[in-house]
């Protein structure tokens, strides 16, 4: 593909400041299913995380990208792990950090995914009908449980990523 060729040329001519380093990144949104056809997500495109993964790879790093659902092409030369939910992202990141603790260490974990803050307390197995007496409202108290934070949790268990850079959205767009 022409874009892959251009990427390889860019990588070839980029100084290898990260040669020999291992980078773990998260990117994109997460999707918390309400039922088989509805869910809670956000408008994250994943562009920042994918661009960081590409830049680190160009600079010589070995990069693993854990990504929620996006419409972006997978960055060339990057190990890709696709996930949907916040729990899946947390599990994938934890597995990578556990693997790193037992074999080859990760030099940097960059968490830029827009991980869901909430999830339904229980996913319905069938589409919830419109005239339902009690739709599963997403509100702070009722059928909502906190979603796991894939950027906050991994560094809390003495893993190599004890200092985890993450970029939260603190203002409305």
Enumerate the language-model features and the residues they cover:
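Internal gly/pro-rich beta-alpha loop/helix module
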Residues: 1-13
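Glycine-rich phosphate/dinucleotide-binding loop and adjoining beta-alpha-beta core of small-molecule
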Residues: 2, 57, 62-173
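Short, functionally important structural connectors and interaction interfaces within domains
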Residues: 10, 26-32, 40, 107, ...
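A generic local secondary-structure boundary/capping motif
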Residues: 12-15, 97
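Glycine-rich phosphate/diphosphate-binding loop of Rossmann-like nucleotide-binding domains
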Residues: 17-85, 167
């Amino acid at each position: 593909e022409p874009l892959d060729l251009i990427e390889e040329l860019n990588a070839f001519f980029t100084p290898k400041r990260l040669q020999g380093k291992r980078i773990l990144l998260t990117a994109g949104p997460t999707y918390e299913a309400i039922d088989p056809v509805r869910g809670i997500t956000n408008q994250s495109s994943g562009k920042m995380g994918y661009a960081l993964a590409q830049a680190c790879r160009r600079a010589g790093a070995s990069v693993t990208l854990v990504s929620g659902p996006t419409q972006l092409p997978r960055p060339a030369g990057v190990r890709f792990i696709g996930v949907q939910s916040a729990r899946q992202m947390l599990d994938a990141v934890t597995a990578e950090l556990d693997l790193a603790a037992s074999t080859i260490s990760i030099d940097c974990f960059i968490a830029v995914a827009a991980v869901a803050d909430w999830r339904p307390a229980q996913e319905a197995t069938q589409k919830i009908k419109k005239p339902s007496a009690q739709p599963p409202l997403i509100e702070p108290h009722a059928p909502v449980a906190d979603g796991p934070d894939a950027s906050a949790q991994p560094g809390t268990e003495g893993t190599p990523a004890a200092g985890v850079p993450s970029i939260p959205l603190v203002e409305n767009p």
